[in-house]
Amino acid sequence: MNYTEAVDYIETIPKFTVKHPPEHTRELLSRLGNPQEGIKIIHVAGTNGKGSVCAYLNAMLLAGGKKTGLFTSPHLVRINERFQINGEDVSDEQFLNAFLKVEKAAKEYEAEGEGHPSYFETLFLMGMLIFKEAGVEYLVMETGLGGRLDATNVVEKPLACIITSISRDHTEYLGGTLEAIAGEKAGIIKAGVPVIYDASQPGPASVIAAKAKEMGSPAWPMEPSFYEMKTQSREGITFTFAYPGGEKAELAIPYVAKYQMMNASLAFYTMHILQDVHDIPKNVLAEGLSKIKWPCRMEMAAPGVIIDGAHNEDGIAQFVSTAGYFAKENEITILFTAVADKHYHEMIGEICEGIHPSHVVATQIDGSRVVPAEVLAEDFRKAGCTDVCAEPEIGAAYEKALGKKGSGMLFCVGSLYLAGELKAYLAKRNG
């Protein structure tokens, strides 16, 4: 089997198996030699921002000269993106080698009457092998869905657990209230392991604090009052960070979104708490933050063109806060799509009310969760936007939106799938 065949096979896995309890994943890890053991792991859960927090942590560890692994999801263009070693995607050879070992163990387990690991479980198992064989010292690991029952939660003794902002997403799996969702995310907390969490919402924060107390885990709430913005421009944000009793740090990030201050601060606070483990000076940590590379998070993909992966109500609210800042001085064009299981009516209403875009192009992501471009366009019209058109094909939609942009700004938003498709399209377009 070659790399392409392996990827094709992995993509078929959801058609013939289901998610399994953690014991199933633990058994397969054991059969693979428990590759996760001996790696210093930071475990990150949350609804929004967990990928960014992972990227900030990875950037700071790299700045400090550490050999790192980064496990995140979803991928935007190529599946290899889910596994990074020292900031670079793993090679096709590393990917295939890990897949063959995992698939061999899975087939043997199946022969004993057990189920094949799910899509995400397969990738998690592959990741643990990839990082062990690469000899990484630190692994920054993002949960797939939720926390308590996530495959990543089989890791028994991480260095720290981080929980980012909580919002209503995947409610059919995680519960309908913020507190219920927070309870699922807090399931990653391990006895005695420090937990650092976004404390900006009292309900979820109280659930996380209670779980930490139950587990005997030191709890470090990250309050919005710990950071203060100094400047915001197209180049990024500068801000100060100081926890009570701590000295003030001057930080800079190459992102325009205000919400990234919380994500960067969560990561910086975690590295402060783990100072005795990594021994990286604070000025080096700050330098690492400033050099982060994490695609499609308010990313300037071309002059005046920003791609953002916001794909639920809270994410869109944060997006609107940032885009609204630029709308004061620029004519705004929106390229938008969403999938059917998101609250896209509310997302569209938020965009129209908060930004009042001059132009809107609606497009669609084909597949089982498709929302036709014309349906989205009609929602924009009902929400009060006037210059709205529908273009189902993403490349053509981008060109149409770019044509409407003029000297203003174009924001592409609504779905991580859209972000990935646009990244692939722009790579081809720009040669």
Describe the function of each predicted region:
Residues 134-137, 329, 385, 406-407:
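Short, high-confidence coil segments that cap the C-terminus of an alpha-helix
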Residues 29, 34-37, 63-156, 172, ...:
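ATP-dependent carboxylate-amine ligase catalytic core
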Residues 38, 138-143, 149-162, 166-170, ...:
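Nucleotide phosphate-binding/pyrophosphate-handling subdomain across enzymes
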Residues 201-216, 304-305, 348-409:
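C-terminal helical cap/extension that packs against the catalytic core
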Residues 1-46, 53-66, 71, 107-115:
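Short functional linear segments
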Residues 198-199, 213-233, 253-258, 285-291, ...:
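Beta-strand->loop->alpha-helix junctions that form or flank phosphate-binding loops
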